[in-house]
């Protein structure tokens, strides 16, 4: 199963989960508690799946099954900004493993309210673009996605990272927040008082193993 198929399945499951919360028919108090607890659980599960995908992709920055086709990992990062990054790697496009050909992978964060499902205006889509294919992304409840870049000497690089400084990137810190796409009522007597459960994750100094080749 390819990574894009996994993304689509995650998105479908998450949207179903949000809609399921609306159909609960238990008592008012129990329904409210259930909505909150399920919302928190969905946020955590969603965050776990997203982090798995990001860690997998980012750890392969500069990787190629045929090293001669990407001999210098220093040149693998093509663009680096606070909420977008483009780099070279060797992707598993058909579920059989990397094929030894260099691919480009581009992540970028869409605008608030573009997710299209649910009523949370803060939710965004994190797009993943493989080579020159159309942008693909799912409504996974992302509200914040921030990248911070460090040199080998732990100096922070200013974003957007200048073209001449891209080769200085040695590690990346990923910060990400997700929220419910559908609000849970806090009180039956005040239906307009709503809340969105949230979860936060930060990966400190993720470094591709391929940087060791420098």
Question: What does each model-identified segment do?
Answer:
Residues 4-65, 213:
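Aliphatic-rich helix starts adjacent to a transmembrane/signal segment
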Residues 35-36, 58-88:
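Short, glycine/small-hydrophobic-rich surface segments
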Residues 43, 80, 165-167:
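Aromatic-acidic/polar surface patches that form glycan- and anion
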Residues 80-158, 197:
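Type IV pilin-like appendage domain
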Residues 134-214:
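Short linear sequence signals and composition-biased patches located at protein termini or domain-edge surfaces
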């Amino acid at each position: 199963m390819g990574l894009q198929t996994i993304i689509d399945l995650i998105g479908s499951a998450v949207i179903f989960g949000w809609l399921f919360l609306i159909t609960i028919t238990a008592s008012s108090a129990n329904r409210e508690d259930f909505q909150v607890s399920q919302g928190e659980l969905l946020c955590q599960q969603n965050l776990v799946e997203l982090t798995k995908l990001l860690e997998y992709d980012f750890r392969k920055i500069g990787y190629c099954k045929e090293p001669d086709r990407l001999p210098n990992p220093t040149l693998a990062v093509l663009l680096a900004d606070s909420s977008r990054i483009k780099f070279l790697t060797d992707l598993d496009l058909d579920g059989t493993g990397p094929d030894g050909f260099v691919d480009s992978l581009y992540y970028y964060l869409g605008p608030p309210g573009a997710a299209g499902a649910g009523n949370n205006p803060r939710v965004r889509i994190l797009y993943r673009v493989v080579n020159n294919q159309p942008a693909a992304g799912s409504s996974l409840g992302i509200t914040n996605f921030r990248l911070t870049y460090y040199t080998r000497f732990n100096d922070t690089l200013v974003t957007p990272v200048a073209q001449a400084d891209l080769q200085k990137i040695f590690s990346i810190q990923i910060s990400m927040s997700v929220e419910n796409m559908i609000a849970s009522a806090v009180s039956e007597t005040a239906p307009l008082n709503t809340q969105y459960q949230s979860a936060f994750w930060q990966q400190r100094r993720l470094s591709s193993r391929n940087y060791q080749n420098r």
